[in-house]
Amino acid sequence: KKSQSLSKHLASGDGGDELFGGYTFRYKKFLTLTNTNSTPLEKAKAYLLCHERDRVPDQEKLFGKKSEFSWESIYKTLIGYFDNPLSPIEQVFLADYNGKLLYNFNPINTRILNQFDMKSISPLLSEEMISYALGIPLQHKYDKTKNVGKLSLRKLLSKYNMDKLITSEKLGFNVNTLNLWKSYGQSLCQEYLIDSEVAKDGWINKDWISKYIHKDDLDVRYVNKFLGLLAFEVWYRLFVTKDMSANTTLN
């Protein structure tokens, strides 16, 4: 919204992590969970364990019958990325690119830009750059000994004496969701989720919501999940049941 007041275009670095090897925390954990004898299924499961912030231990109990949640269907979706002659880390690259980037980050960012009538400038996601980046050898993307990624991009920055602007460690974009939960996140979730439309319509398990929503000492994974459910509920009321105005302010 702020960018809209300054320009009709928004520059984005989307694709940098997926194409040039930026998710070093994931690569390191994946390598500790797998070995040369790991099967494609075992690697798919290990890959999911590298996304611990995106799930809760009792994930399968969160969904209602209408969602038809199944770990087996998720494994089936992922296993192809790990059933090929690529090296283990290159398999993770493949899964990352075909997962969150294509079906999460890119669609969401596009919708947000469309909402504010803006256009994205994403040079790393041009056809030419994607084609080029996919052919870069692994040793020019990730150093597993030092656990440093984006080696080609770092070399480019060094060439122009700009490497001091970055750190060797991958810094994720993180919001302190626990503080958000304690300040007003929990009360908002209670307001919208205790009698939620997504639970009434069978997408989310009402018993799961009731079990955790009043707890004050929730693990951050549950906090993150509740905030995600709040977003789902708001979207559902806006576009499915249509009993909520787009001008409504959450307070």
Segments the model singles out, each with a brief description of its role:
Residues S5-A11, S38, E42-N251:
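Adenosyl-5′-phosphate
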